[in-house]
From Swiss-Prot:
The lineage of its organism: Eukaryota, Metazoa, Spiralia, Lophotrochozoa, Mollusca. This is Alpha-conotoxin VxXXB. Keywords: Acetylcholine receptor inhibiting toxin, Amidation, Disulfide bond, Gamma-carboxyglutamic acid, Hydroxylation, Ion channel impairing toxin, Neurotoxin, Postsynaptic neurotoxin, Secreted, Signal, Toxin. One of its GO terms (molecular function) is ion channel regulator activity. GO terms for cellular component: extracellular region; host cell postsynaptic membrane.
Amino acid sequence: MPKLAVVLLVLLILPLSYFDAAGGQAVQGDWRGNRLARDLQRGGRDDESECIINTRDSPWGRCCRTRMCGSMCCPRNGCTCVYHWRRGHGCSCPG
């Protein structure tokens, strides 16, 4: 097989790894593993999450299963986001 044919064959097969067996697009995630995206892909779409849609210099957003506070997620449900002068945003959790 000539080199060009092999390259074209690889380029045709390579995109198939981005799709799962059911024919939908597989979640690729980032290097830490994007658990929330995988959960949403599996059908937890009715879970409401707070999200930052765009992050600087990145096409990815960030979603929280709890409250979104500044650029972070609060550790559990029931927290409120407060602003501390000179320290920025932080979560205030009961108990």
